[in-house]
Every structure is written in structure tokens, then in C-alpha cells.
Amino acid sequence: MSDNSYKPYALGAARAGVDGGFKPGNDDPFYSGLSDQLADKGYFTAAADDLISWARTGSLMWMTFGLACCAVEMMHAGNPRYDLERFGMAPRGSPRQSDVMIVAGTLTNKMAPALRKVYDQMPEPRYVISMGSCANGGGYYHYSYSVVRGCDRIVPVDIYIPGCPPTAEALVYGFLQLQKKIRREGSIER
């Protein structure tokens, strides 16, 4: 390289500080108020929120609250043909280790407090999938005196899967919709 070539790393004597480095002036936008800009625009918060929601969607742990015949279709979704684990969703036996509860089947008045107790044991953020006509609105037994007309009267439901019974494909689609919902929602409150 010749002495006349452009050297972006070389500073003139006028711009060099006492330490030999560049001293920013008061009008330098990078150094003045960087934390103010981050607080205002939330760059770091948005990036962390995207990272957290990506991690949550790729590691959903689900548990079953299988009450009737819809639970059989739920078992099909976990088998090799549909394989929910390839989407990052694995079954768990304890509510304390799960993020998603699948309510599948007819919910009776006697079973409703147990459903609420299991839901309360789940850590935040927690999600509920209502699977089948019976869990969605009472289904075939809607007019029975002992049936809760939808599990959304007991716990907040995020995804409804219709059908009697819904297929395993419908459950996989419901899980994918739940992943989209988690990505859309933020997890960090500002």
C-alpha cells in the first residue's frame, strides 16, 4: 500500500485524543443517549422478546386431561405417524412441568374443580387447548344436568379444536396455531 491510500483506521493528530483514541463530541448520536434510545425504541427488549418466544414455541411441553374418546385421537398425534415431537412438543406427566394442557372429552361438574386445580399448578405462561365438541361446548351431552357446557367456563382456553372426535391432524394443526399465537404475543411486559 502506498502512503497516499485511504486508511480508515488512521486518525489525524487533530482528531486523536490524549489516549491516542477518538474522543466523541457531544453531538455524536451513538455515544450520547444510547441508553435513552434503547429505552425509547426498545431494540434490546424486542430482540429478547423474539428470542424468548422462539424458544417457547420450539419447546412446548403438553399434558393431557383426557376425559373421553378424544383422548384416543390425542394419543395418535403422539405416535410416529404424526409425531408431535418433531414440532418441538413433548408430553409430560406432571402439570408442574407442562406449558400446554389439552382438555379432551366431556367435562362434568364433579370433575371441574380438579381441572381448575391442575390448571393452577401449571407454571406461567400456560396455554389450554380445548379438543372436541364435548370440551368446547358440552357436545352430545350438552343438555345433561351434570355436564359443564364448555371447559372455557372453568379455565381460559387459547385454541378450540372442533370435531367429534377431531382427527390427529386437527390436533397437530391446533398446536401449530398455538405456536403462531405465542410468536404473535409478546412475553416481556413493557
Swiss-Prot record:
Positions that bind [4Fe-4S] cluster: C69, C70, C134, C164
Cofactor comment: Binds 1 [4Fe-4S] cluster.
Biological processes annotated in GO: aerobic respiration; electron transport coupled proton transport
EC number per UniProt: 7.1.1.-
Reaction(s) catalysed by this chain's protein: a quinone + NADH + 5 H(+)(in) = a quinol + NAD(+) + 4 H(+)(out)
One Gene Ontology MF term: 4 iron, 4 sulfur cluster binding
GO cellular component: plasma membrane; respiratory chain complex I
Cofactor(s) named in the record: [4Fe-4S] cluster
Record's bilayer topology term: Peripheral membrane protein
Localization in the cell: Cell inner membrane
Keyword terms, alphabetized: 4Fe-4S, Cell inner membrane, Cell membrane, Iron, Iron-sulfur, Membrane, Metal-binding, NAD, Quinone, Translocase, Transport, Ubiquinone
Subunit structure: NDH-1 is composed of 14 different subunits. Subunits NuoB, C, D, E, F, and G constitute the peripheral sector of the complex.
Record family assignment: Belongs to the complex I 20 kDa subunit family.
Function, in words: NDH-1 shuttles electrons from NADH, via FMN and iron-sulfur (Fe-S) centers, to quinones in the respiratory chain. Couples the redox reaction to proton translocation (for every two electrons transferred, four hydrogen ions are translocated across the cytoplasmic membrane), and thus conserves the redox energy in a proton gradient.
Name the record gives this protein: NADH-quinone oxidoreductase subunit B
Source organism of this protein record: Hyphomonas neptunium (strain ATCC 15444)
